Design a protein with these regions (language model features):
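A short helix->loop->beta-strand "cap" motif at the edges of active sites that frequently abuts
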Residues: 2, 97-101, 141
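Generic recognition of short, well-ordered alpha-helical segments
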Residues: 17-21, 46, 74-78, 158
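Glycine-rich phosphate/pyrophosphate-binding loop and the adjoining helix
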Residues: 23, 131-195
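Short beta-strand elements in bilobed, periplasmic/extracellular small-molecule ligand-binding domains
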Residues: 30-38, 142-148
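N-terminal beta-loop-helix "entrance" segment that forms/cooperates
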Residues: 32-55
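Helix-loop-strand module that forms the ligand-binding subsite of alpha/beta enzymes
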Residues: 49-133
Length: 195
């Protein structure tokens, strides 16, 4: 088990500047595996066994996506529901991701000032992406600080190249901002809805 799995979830990566540049930079990183969800599953069902094997083969997982209606694109949401099953990712017997590291890389057209308590949205980008940190907590994973680029519509080529360089550094060296305990949280006593 080694390396970083970068799961790219951009609905139109061929016409993306930022996510395409980040994915290309990650592909050039010897310790990274880039997995494009939209290219792998353009319109068919997601292969759960294949996806779980990819996750099991890596110790760091980074979900890379453009912020879409203050969340992730639909294919990534579908992927999470399909792959992160009770008994595998969480709940009784669900220890497959325990003590791995999860991170997100998010781009957004809105500028950074929009994502502040006094900004246009009244919340920070960390607050908007909190569900991903909660996913890490629920599955027993460490959580990296988010890698973000805001104001992408105004991003020139030099800023984009610098962002891609910083992204690779982040993929290789970022330390978790929240560490999982690694101890059994007695999830067997947690009641989960059935049906």
């Amino acid at each position: 088990m080694a390396g970083t799995l970068v799961i790219v979830a951009h609905p139109d990566l061929a016409h993306s500047r930022v996510n395409a540049a980040w994915a290309a930079a990650a592909r050039d990183c010897a310790t990274c595996t880039v997995h494009d969800l939209y290219a792998t599953y353009p319109d068919g069902p997601i292969d759960g066994a294949h996806e779980r094997a990819l996750l099991e083969a890596h110790d760091r997982i980074v979900l890379q996506f453009p912020l879409t209606w203050y969340s992730c694109p639909p294919r990534l949401s579908e992927w999470m529901v399909t792959i992160l099953k009770r008994g595998w990712a969480y709940g009784p017997g669900g220890r497959a991701l325990q003590l791995k590291t999860l991170g997100i890389a998010v781009s957004t057209g809105s500028n950074g000032a929009d994502y502040s308590p006094d900004g246009r949205y009244g919340h920070t980008l960390d607050a908007v992406t909190l569900p991903f940190e909660l996913l890490a907590i629920h599955t027993g994973m460490h959580y990296l600080p988010a890698f973000t680029l805001t104001g992408v519509r105004d991003c020139d080529d030099a800023a984009l190249a610098q962002s891609a360089m910083h992204y690779v550094r982040h993929l290789r060296h970022a330390a978790p901002r929240r560490c999982a305990s690694g101890q059994d949280d007695d999830r067997a006593k947690t009641r989960y809805p059935t049906g």
